């Protein structure tokens, strides 16, 4: 996939994000992907954190994936945990094998902690801040990571 998601934290503590996509090849005329839909391809809450997505947009926007990542951070999960739990939740709700979803998330919280998770083998992502720059590999999720841990989802627990 050719989507680029960027999340950043300025020296003054302001969070920002952006995303760009080339779109799905051979798409249906008029298709709108997840990138321009706030909460799907990108979401920033300056009190909590920011998240961006890449992958099959339809599988991300049906669940407002980036918004969900930030909400999990609001509940206390680290950025990587929030990305992974979002993928697990989408997989549980969708019902298809997790590898068929082709979704990936990056996240950054207000404290400057970052993380990422993706389906299948995951994906590489870049991190840079003063004195550090590297390309890292995201957490990789497959069928064995879905589970049905009932009661471990702080968002779903609030809806009960």
PLM region spans:
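N-terminal nucleophile
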Residues: 1-160
């Amino acid at each position: 996939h050719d989507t680029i998601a960027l999340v950043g934290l300025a020296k003054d503590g302001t969070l920002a994000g952006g995303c760009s996509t080339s779109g799905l090849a051979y798409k249906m005329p008029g298709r709108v992907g997840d990138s321009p839909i706030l909460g799907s391809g990108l979401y920033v809450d300056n009190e909590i954190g920011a998240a961006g997505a890449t992958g099959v947009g339809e599988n991300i926007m049906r669940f407002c994936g980036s918004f969900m990542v930030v909400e999990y951070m609001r509940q206390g999960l680290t950025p990587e945990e929030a990305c992974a739990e979002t993928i697990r939740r989408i997989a549980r709700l969708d019902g298809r094998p997790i590898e068929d979803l082709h979704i990936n998330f990056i996240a950054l919280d207000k404290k400057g902690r970052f993380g990422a998770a993706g389906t299948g083998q995951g994906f590489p992502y870049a991190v840079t801040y003063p004195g550090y720059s590297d390309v890292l590999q995201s957490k990789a999720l497959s069928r064995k990571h879905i589970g049905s841990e009932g009661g471990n989802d702080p968002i779903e627990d609030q809806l009960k």
